[in-house]
From Swiss-Prot:
It is a multi-pass membrane protein. Signal peptide: none annotated. ATP binds at residues 293-300. It is an enzyme of class 3 (hydrolase). Keywords: ATP-binding, Cell cycle, Cell division, Chloroplast, Hydrolase, Membrane, Metal-binding, Metalloprotease, Nucleotide-binding, Plastid, Protease, Transit peptide, Transmembrane, Transmembrane helix, Zinc. The chain crosses the membrane at residues 54-74, 196-216. Its cofactor is Zn(2+). GO terms for biological process: cell division; proteolysis. It comes from Medicago sativa (Alfalfa). Seems to act as an ATP-dependent zinc metallopeptidase. This is ATP-dependent zinc metalloprotease FTSH, chloroplastic. In the N-terminal section; belongs to the AAA ATPase family. The keyword Signal does not apply.
Length: 706
């Protein structure tokens, strides 16, 4: 059986490792670095001496093959001859005595010239890889030209036709081509590649720079500027909301319970609408108006009403929006806000919660170049600086006027400070009427009674009250909101929701009933003290029971408390502990802990701040250094000696002991009423003020006289 050299070598490379091959000299071929240049792996079998003839034959075949390569015949311009042929006699194979599949008697004969036929070549200009390998092994491929990346090659067949082949990752391809006498070359690319690479190296950085330039231009004034899609320079842009014709849906008619504040702001609105009326008298438009008041009193609502009434351009923002991640953003946004406002003058700029940037300077904490200080300095300059802000009215709101910088509050910046305080009874009635719109109310709902039971409530508190009452009515499947739902909603807001599933033992229930009865009894018999509104032993929140007193409206509005009222307040707070002592000193509980804290706080204020101590006198001590973060003193030093501190402690103890004695005297005198009231609470769990007073009248109780 005859084997061609190409067949023998291809068999060796395709894995026929049982055929030993000698070490040969590799053909000198210029190949790209990424191709594998290993052609043969010599396999030496020292234990088999019968393989020497086949080794000699293979060596001769390789020598003949290398002698007839195109490189060797290039000088004569002759075509390369076909490779030599190894002939092996099949009857000489002796597998039992040799590891080679061939016998030792192998003769090397000259190759027989054969005419190449082009009819066996594939058609088309694109060959499959398997077709390409078959053509190479049959000697029908003259040369190949690899692309620069080695993924594609172009072949030239012996008949001159050309075709392209997609090259897979085959490490044996170069070996196969070399052993079959195929000329190998690599494409160096197009002639213009060098120029293209040079231009590309310059073009890419230019495009990157142009892209960055467009992004920054977009952030400064392009589509990403004010009202745009955003950009990196938007950090310095104000985030204020602008309305050319404000449509807040709120007018002064929707604001109730703040008549004085409305009057002040209505003048500002009238100034914008009718400036000639004021300028004829030489009046100047106020530059700023600061709304001051507790949280929930309607400062922002008033600002929305101003926007709805004025009919002028309106800018609104929160002070916290000025300060961002980067240093200097606050001052930049203040400048941007006032630049836009001046372009729309006359207009109104509303800054909510201005204490976020307007805090007092000079504390020195966090360095002298504090970001907040830069922002407030820029704000001061814009409001009343060298250039002024003609036509721009600044409307601001805060619930912390004590922390604002004095330079911000002076006339010329904030000319007016409008106090928006908690509403009185008449104001609460109007607010309840506003927030009851759209709600189905029963006929027994009396706004005047609700207003008198809610002293100190702000507009937001009353809005929440009516909303909670509506939710309770819906939960109970009612079609109207009655006074019971409003009363339950009020207790829920003050003390928390009822613990309906709480398991309370009879002993604990009795103890809580006596504790609350003690508070109510002492409070009702103290002269000039608040009347009892309701007593309940239903657990709510953290409290096991509650006693509601109706504080005086006049006392709340004025904030003036007499010495007798404070002494009565301490006695009422201690009435619960005194009532628990009915069961013996060993049965008192920790339920009076909050009462003790309240008593101690009131007694210490009476001695240190109010001048109600004869030994200390009319002196305020223990004021401290103030809050260092508000620009005040860092440390809080005592301004009195240790001897004075001992006197203060003794005076506080004396006031508390006196209040305890008064509560004990009242309960011991009216012990029968205490038992009846506690029993009534155990039975009903809730006793209102009218039922409580009827019990007092029946028991012929008398007011305490010191």
């Amino acid at each position: 059986m005859a084997f061609s050299t190409s067949s023998l070598l291809s068999t060796n490379f395709l894995g026929a490792r049982n055929i030993p091959t000698p070490k040969t000299t590799k053909p000198s071929i210029s190949l790209p670095l990424f191709f594998k240049t290993k052609f043969f792996n010599s396999q030496n079998d020292n234990n088999n001496n019968n393989s020497e003839p086949i080794k000699s034959a293979a060596v001769s075949a390789l020598i003949l093959s290398s002698m007839f390569t195109p490189a060797a015949l290039a000088a004569d311009n002759l075509p390369p001859p076909p490779p030599p042929v190894l002939e092996a006699q099949p009857n000489q194979l002796n597998p039992a005595n040799s590891t080679s599949p061939f016998s030792q008697n192998i003769s090397l004969t000259a190759p027989k010239p054969q005419a190449q036929s082009s009819t066996d070549l594939p058609d088309g200009s694109q060959w499959r890889y398997s077709e390409f390998l078959n053509a190479v092994k049959k000697g029908k491929v003259e040369r190949v030209r690899f692309s620069k990346d080695g993924s594609v090659l172009q072949l030239t067949a012996v008949d001159g036709r050309r075709a392209n082949v997609i090259v897979p990752n085959d490490p044996d391809l170069i070996d196969i081509l070399a052993m079959n006498g195929v000329d190998i070359s690599v494409s160096e690319g197009e002639q213009g590649n060098g120029l293209f690479s040079f231009v590309g190296s310059l073009l890419l950085p230019f495009l990157a720079f142009a892209g960055l330039f467009l992004i920054f231009r977009r952030g400064q004034g392009g589509p990403g500027g004010p009202g745009g899609l955003g950009g990196p320079m938007d950090f310095g842009r104000s985030k204020s909301k602008f309305q050319e014709v404000p449509e807040t849906g709120v007018t002064f008619a929707d604001v109730a319970g703040a008549d004085q504040a409305k009057l002040e702001l209505q003048e500002v609105v009238d100034f914008l609408k009718n400036p000639d009326k004021y300028t004829a008298l030489g009046a100047k438009i106020p530059k700023g108006c600061l709304l001051v008041g507790p949280p929930g009193t309607g400062k922002t609502l008033l600002a929305r009403a101003v926007a709805g009434e004025a009919g002028t351009p309106f800018f609104s923002c929160a002070a916290s929006e000025f300060v961002e991640l980067f240093v200097g953003v606050g001052a930049s946004r203040v400048r941007d806000l006032f630049e836009k406002a001046k372009s729309k003058a006359p207009c109104i700029v509303f800054i909510d919660e201005i204490d976020a940037v307007g805090r007092q300077r000079g504390a020195g904490l966090g360095g002298g170049n504090d970001e907040r200080e830069q922002t407030i300095n820029q704000l001061l300059t814009e409001m009343d600086g060298f250039s002024g802000n003609s036509g721009v009215i600044v409307l601001a709101a805060t619930n912390r006027p004590d922390v604002l910088d004095s330079a911000l509050l002076r006339p010329g910046r904030f000319d007016r400070q409008v106090t928006v305080d908690r509403p009185d009874v008449a104001g609460r009635v109007k607010i309840l009427q506003v927030h009851s719109r759209g709600k189905a109310l029963a006929k027994d709902v009396d706004f005047d009674k609700i207003a008198r039971r809610t002293p100190g409530f702000t507009g937001v508190d009353l809005q929440n009250l009516m909303n909670e009452a509506a939710i309770l009515a819906a939960r109970r499947d009612l079609k109207e909101i009655s006074k019971d739902e409003i009363a339950d909603a009020l207790e829920r807001i003050i003390a928390g929701p009822e613990k309906k599933n709480a398991v309370v033992s009879e002993e604990k229930k009795k103890l809580v009933a006596y504790h609350e009865a003690g508070h109510a009894l002492v409070g009702a018999l103290m002269p000039e003290y608040d009347p009892v509104a309701k007593i309940s032993i239903i657990p709510r929140g953290q409290a096991g029971g509650l006693t509601f007193f109706a504080p005086s409206e006049e006392r709340l509005e004025s904030g003036l408390y007499s010495r007798s009222y404070l002494e009565n307040q301490m006695a009422v707070a201690l009435g619960g502990r005194v009532a628990e002592e009915v069961f013996g000193q060993d049965n008192v509980t920790t339920g009076a802990s909050n009462d003790f804290m309240q008593v101690s706080r009131v007694a210490r204020q009476m001695v240190e701040r109010f001048g109600f101590s004869k030994k200390i006198g009319q002196v305020a001590i223990g004021g401290g250094g103030g809050n260092p973060f508000l620009g005040q003193q860092m440390s809080s030093q005592k301004d009195y000696s240790m001897a004075t501190a001992d006197i203060v402690d003794k005076e506080v103890r004396e006031l508390v002991d006196k209040a305890y004695e008064r509560a004990t005297q009242i309960i011991n005198t009216h012990i029968d009423i205490l038992h009846k009231l506690a029993q009534l609470l155990i039975e009903k769990e809730t006793v209102d003020g009218e039922e409580f007073m009827s019990l007092f009248i029946d028991g012929k109780a008398e007011l305490y006289v010191s």
